[in-house]
């Protein structure tokens, strides 16, 4: 097929019928990632690396405006109408901190391949009209009230405890030169002064084929797929947005080659100004603690989020080990952290969750504690530190750890059977955003079972060493 060059192809080692291929257009730089497996549904995730250094919410506003029509189909509702004819449940999208993805799921491939070029026309060549901006993003209504779909959505979120704590964490971890610091949904104060011209400029820069990937999941006829992809690639050339495989001169890959690639910082004594707001207290080397106020009628409880810097994103074994360790610590009423904080006469919280955000520079591990009694807010992270040190001194319950590992294997295989598109899409989107462009990093990303085999050989000492390195001796950020 003219223009689309083979980059990478691999079978899943533990599921040979599942194959992943990656291509990159030599004419436009458009990346295509295709996971092939038998399934009645076909999924697409049109993904763009959307880097923004302000709180204007431009990536989020674009996500909404795309659905209002395109150059070839300048009417709202065209996508939903076509989706119904293709046995699809409409179209959808999400805006994350580092990307925007537009989703399509259809029953069967015929309607899917007919709809994909239409969907891409909406994403890459939207109308972006003044009237669409006024209705969808921001306006003042007849009652002299702030209004607009995006504005109203963020009005409902901006002052929630979860959003306030997450934004404060981002502000503390990243310097002002990093896009990870931004509120990509848009703060209300910024949305009120945003203009359609700013959105058009952003779209022209980031909604380009060299900064986009079409992630496909499901069974498709190769010849028909390449025909559809070729029509999409040709459209870029026709519209003059094709700037070659590597983009225009001076183009830098978002998050990977820009200032956002700088690792986050918790130890504020080593890099002046990184992640520090003027009103925040000075940090010490092992603990930075900040407070966030949010509107709440019940002042008897609060929330606590503790963050540590994790390994780099390419250390997949260490990341999977930390994921398993987090499950061991929190997954059930018999887990150590549930026993210590929840399953007691006077609970110190009602729920605990440990997860990680995989970002350029370093990943970030975060433990979230819900509904913490106000009297315990100041002491919770110290209580956690004492518990973790006690676990290290007593050792890991290896019988239970083996059970956790076995259950995690079974959960992955079950998801691969029941929801394969979800399993593949996360890995493939991550590879597009941060992976090596020749596809050589995919082999390791897809081989979860090999890593489970390696973790099966971990001793109690190996697990406690991991716990000590990342959750005890590592500097922590405490947001209360």
Question: Each predicted region: which residue ranges?
Answer:
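A generic structural motif
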Residues: 50-52, 106-110, 218-222, 310-313, ...
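C-terminal regions of mature proteins
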Residues: 218, 404-480
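Short, small-residue-biased leader/transition segments that mark boundaries at the very start
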Residues: 1-8
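An aromatic/glycine/proline-enriched structural segment found at the starts
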Residues: 213-302
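Acidic/histidine-enriched segments that form metal/cofactor-coordinating
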Residues: 69-71, 78-202, 247-251, 306, ...
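Histidine-acidic residue clusters that define the catalytic metal-binding segment
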Residues: 18-22, 154-159, 163-213, 222, ...
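Active/ligand-binding-proximal structured segments within catalytic/core domains
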Residues: 36-78, 82, 316-329
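Short, hydrophobic beta-strand segments
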Residues: 46, 104, 304-307, 363-371
